[in-house]
């Protein structure tokens, strides 16, 4: 029974699941958009939105927390210098998810595109 279990496991252990979201978040920050399955996109949304909210604070402590969670200083720097200032006036809702028409070959998983609402081109 799944009583009081809020997170999806994606059939991975905790460390593997964290690594999955860190890598997807890095790709999203560097490229502005990522194509993945719909459940992963929905889970990634909450992970990334918490990071952007932290980066908006613009304190040394928040910068260290972002770098610690992303495990990459270059990506963290891009997040709090380029992306976070775009969302200074916005209180959440930094990403949008589009459902894609074609399904994944093999298991037929529903594909989605997750992107930042305002991203510099």
Swiss-Prot record:
Q: What do the Gene Ontology cellular component annotations say?
A: cytosolic large ribosomal subunit
What are the TM regions of this chain, as residue ranges? none
**What Gene3D superfamilies does the annotation carry?**
Ribosomal protein L17 (3.90.1030.10)
Q: Which UniProt keywords apply?
A: Ribonucleoprotein, Ribosomal protein
GO annotation, biological process: translation
Q: How does it assemble?
A: Part of the 50S ribosomal subunit. Contacts protein L32.
| Name this protein carries in UniProt | Large ribosomal subunit protein bL17
**Organism this protein belongs to:** Sulfurihydrogenibium sp. (strain YO3AOP1)
